[in-house]
């Protein structure tokens, strides 16, 4: 299921762009702010897979990897619990110099309307976690499970 919804958010991180870039392409660093574990091949055409919460994996392929500047990758959820199949949406991360370090600008495209809010909430929680771990602080707690179907911001069964 693809759509035309877009999520855009930003976060200032207290480190230079080259340092922040490493937190997107090193599996241990990435897992420290966005999940539990990760396997990454950060090169155009390379794959990634990471477990965000227990048993829920995201995966995709890198489209662009420009050290210290940007990372673009496809995105999706493997289990089907969230109706965004791997490869059906695209995430672009731009790293811009900022007086306080780096402005991380994230744009997630091609989301269906029913999952836009979930992804907006997720990215708006994960980017502050990134800022915290880069600064050497404990990350802000994140839920350990996805919402139950009745709490989820998408229909639990397909509509007519």
Where in the sequence are the language-model features?
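Conserved catalytic core of Hanks-type protein kinase domains
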Residues: 23-24, 65
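Hydrophobic/aromatic beta-strand elements that line small-molecule binding cavities or substrate pockets
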Residues: 11, 59-64, 89-96
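A short, structured loop/turn motif at beta-sheet edges
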Residues: 17-18, 63-69, 94-103
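Short beta-edge strand/loop motif at the mouth of beta-sheet-based domains
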Residues: 2, 8-9, 15, 19, ...
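Hydrophobic pocket/interface hotspot
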Residues: 20, 30, 48, 62, ...
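Short, solvent-exposed secondary-structure boundary/capping segments
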Residues: 69-76
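A conserved amphipathic terminal alpha-helix motif
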Residues: 110-160
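Beta-strand/loop substructures that line and gate deep hydrophobic ligand-binding cavities in soluble
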Residues: 6, 81-125, 141-143
